[in-house]
C-alpha cells in the first residue's frame, strides 16, 4: 500500500482534486517546451480528465494524481498508477515541476523520494515514457536513474520512448 505522506521528505503531498485545477493549469502553462513535444496544449478540462483516466483493467484506487506543495505553492504534479503495466511496477504517466522551481534539484529530490516510497510499498520498478526529441526530459530522466528499455511507441502526434528504473 502506497503511503502518500512518505513520498516526500521536503514537501507536502496530497491528491489533487477538482478544486486544484487552476493551480495545476498555471503549473503546466509554465512549461511550454513540454507541449511542443507532447501536444496538445493542456486545458483545464484536460487536467480534470487526467485526474480520473486510468488504463484498462485498473481502477481509481490504483491512481494517484498528486500535488507537491511548498507551503501553499504547487511546485510539482505527478500522475502515478500502481501495479501497472504489471503487478511489480508503478507507471508515471505525468511528472512536471513548475518552471520557476526547475534547475534547483527539486525534481530530482521528488523522483528520489517517490522511488523510495514506491519501493517501500513493495514494487520493483518504475516505468514511464517521454516524448522523443525532448532532450530536457531525456537528460533529467537519465540523471535520475532511468534507462531506455528499447521500446518506442507511436501515439497520435508524436512518439514516446519508454524508460524504467529498477528499485
Predicted regions, residues:
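Acetyl-CoA-dependent GNAT
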Residues: 4-11, 15-21, 26-100, 111-113, ...
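Short secondary-structure capping/turn micro-motifs that flank functional sites
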Residues: 44-45, 134-135, 157-158
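Glycine-rich acyl-CoA binding loop
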Residues: 103-108
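Conserved short alpha-helix immediately C-terminal to the canonical SAM/SAH-binding motif I
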Residues: 110, 134-137
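Conserved GNAT acetyl-CoA-binding A-motif
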Residues: 118-129
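Conserved catalytic-core motifs of GNAT/GCN5-like acyltransferases
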Residues: 129-131, 142, 147-162
